[in-house]
Every structure is written in C-alpha cells, then in structure tokens.
C-alpha cells in the first residue's frame, strides 16, 4: 500500500490540506484526526495509515504506507556548496560523497531517516550515517531501507521498513 504523491506547492493551501485530500480520495479516510508528536511529526490518531511530508520551494512530496515512513526531497539543481558541510560528516561518508549528487543522496537519506525516527534534525541528524546504502544511528544499523526516486529534477529519498522500490507514484 506504499504510495508517493508529488504535488505542486500551489495546488493546496498547505501540506495538511494535501494530506487530508489524499487520505479521503485514495484511502477512504474522511475527516481524519491528525495529531503531532512532541517533535512535530504528524500522524493519524488511529495509525490506520502512516505518512510523511517534505517541502521544497515548488513542490510537496508525501509518502503513505501501512508502516512508519519518512520522506525528504531536494531539487537536483539546488546551488549548494557541500564541501564545508561534509566536514561534519564521518570519514566513511566523506569518501562516498564525491559530487553534489552524492551529497544530496546522503543528505536526503539522513533527513528521511530522521522523519522515520520521529526525531529532530538538531538532535538526530549528526548521529546518523549513510554508508553503502545503509543508515546507522550511532553504531546501530536501522532496520530500514532507503530508496531514491527520481521525479522531475528532484531526488526523493524514502526510508521505511518496507521496500519502496516499486512504489506507485502519483502526480497531482
């Protein structure tokens, strides 16, 4: 039941409107009660469907699953000087980050893992490592898979215990 939605920012008033519309239209959940964890992660009161949302300047990306999920996206043309940033990454990660695209894969993988954890960037991002396609929190490898989905000029990372390799992608 894994689904990814790609929505232009101007299609909905805000991301919560997009979530409510998608839940009603694609999952038959009318008037969902959406709560937030202490760290701000939105969730359904009855956990019938798990979801994660990420924003870019021009788009929303939403992941839905019957298990916990995290999503992040970045525009591949984003102008970013990644060399000063990766100085804070582990030596093994720095070896893998050979160009901007590798940096964006690493960054989106880790941010989607933070969302899967229900954590915060400030607390958890630096504790995560993305090496050889696997995410670790400190010394512990997470029981997740991170899949990258190219959509237009975006790199979209989805982290879940489910395999999103053959995910249905819906463009609204």
Regions found by a protein language model. Give the residues of each.
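Core catalytic alpha/beta fold that binds nucleotide/phospho-ligands
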Residues: 1-172
């Amino acid at each position: 039941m894994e689904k990814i939605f790609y929505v232009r920012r101007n299609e909905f008033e805000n991301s919560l409107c997009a979530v409510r519309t998608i839940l009603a239209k694609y999952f038959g959940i009318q008037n969902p009660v959406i709560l937030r964890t202490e760290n701000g992660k939105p969730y359904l009161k009855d956990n019938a469907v798990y979801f994660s949302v990420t924003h870019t300047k021009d788009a929303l990306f939403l992941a839905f699953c019957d298990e916990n999920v995290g999503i992040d996206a970045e525009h591949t043309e984003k102008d970013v000087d990644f060399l000063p940033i990766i100085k804070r990454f582990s030596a093994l990660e720095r070896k893998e980050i050979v160009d901007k695209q590798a940096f964006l894969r690493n960054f989106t993988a880790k941010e989607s893992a933070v969302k899967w954890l229900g954590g915060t960037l400030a607390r958890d991002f630096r504790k995560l490592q993305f090496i050889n396609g696997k995410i670790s929190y400190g010394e512990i490898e997470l029981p997740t898979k991170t899949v990258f989905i190219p959509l237009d000029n975006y790199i979209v990372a989805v982290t879940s215990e489910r395999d999103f390799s053959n995910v249905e992608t819906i463009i609204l």
